[in-house]
């Protein structure tokens, strides 16, 4: 519990390295291996390059509407690094990089955002729930999973995240409160990218430090530079170890900047200036980690170029798999979700089959 705070209002973000990739504290011990750092950089670039391809495909009518992860790659991959493989993840609609870290294949994310139900059929071995669109519901899911882990005395945690705007939802407080009362194994996260669609944080909340919302529930919290991979990893590891130890839940606020649109149906140029975007890009998470890796000779130009080539091939292969995959039938949708159908579900299934047949 080295970096968690109980009641004092934090005034600064927890950071490990600056925009140039230099350690803020030269004596800070990096516990991640070079291979872990390079793998993290690979996944961050996979997420970003895939998002950029998807934006092009969507504009060309080859994909449906989706929510890019641009600007949140470090905090999401950092979250993954701080978890164990038997911990649970309850994603929201902007959790693609975290899901890639957990092992979910790129083609599965493409299937989801192209309206194919197979995109939600995630292999149970990844312990990652399907993408949740309903804002706030994932907090209840994570609280419930934390209850299960606590009840079974399993040394694992359930992790979820929500946007800054989502902290105004009732389920945000309700889930944290009940998890705190019963000391469930849950880590709640806020991905504060400073915009709820077009609404700025100052118009969403009377406090700019969203982590203080944990005080009402009596749980510890930490506010982290979400553009810093290592700080994000250390915060998640610290929080997860605290929660898995039977101490109850934790709240982490990751502070970042949403570089792209809320979704592809949104145009951010309407509500923010180019100058503002350029300022936000100065702390770009991918560039910051690149600076860190190059500065410490963990990665070089040739290795990076080889990495990018591999990523391009992986994305293209995923797209081709998505295109060739067939939509699931109504029977498959119901049979995948329910072991046994109630009379009401049987009726709904018949209505759905008739509707889609027509």
From Swiss-Prot:
Reactions catalysed: N(6)-[(R)-lipoyl]-L-lysyl-[protein] + pyruvate + H(+) = N(6)-[(R)-S(8)-acetyldihydrolipoyl]-L-lysyl-[protein] + CO2
Stored Gene3D superfamilies: 3.40.50.970
UniProt keyword annotation of Disulfide bond present: no
Domain of life assignment: Bacteria
Necessary cofactors: thiamine diphosphate
This enzyme's EC code(s): 1.2.4.1
Sorted UniProt keywords: Oxidoreductase, Pyruvate, Thiamine pyrophosphate
UniProt GO MF annotations: glycosylation-dependent protein binding; pyruvate dehydrogenase (acetyl-transferring) activity
InterPro entries: Alpha-ketoacid_DH_E1_comp (IPR050771), DH_E1 (IPR001017), PdhA/BkdA (IPR017596), THDP-binding (IPR029061)
Pfam families recorded: E1_dh (PF00676)
Gene: pdhA
Function: The pyruvate dehydrogenase complex catalyzes the overall conversion of pyruvate to acetyl-CoA and CO(2). It contains multiple copies of three enzymatic components: pyruvate dehydrogenase (E1), dihydrolipoamide acetyltransferase (E2) and lipoamide dehydrogenase (E3).
Keyword field contains Oxidoreductase: yes
The name this protein goes by in its record: Pyruvate dehydrogenase E1 component subunit alpha
Gene Ontology BP, a term: branched-chain amino acid catabolic process
Subunit structure of this chain's protein: Heterodimer of an alpha and a beta chain.
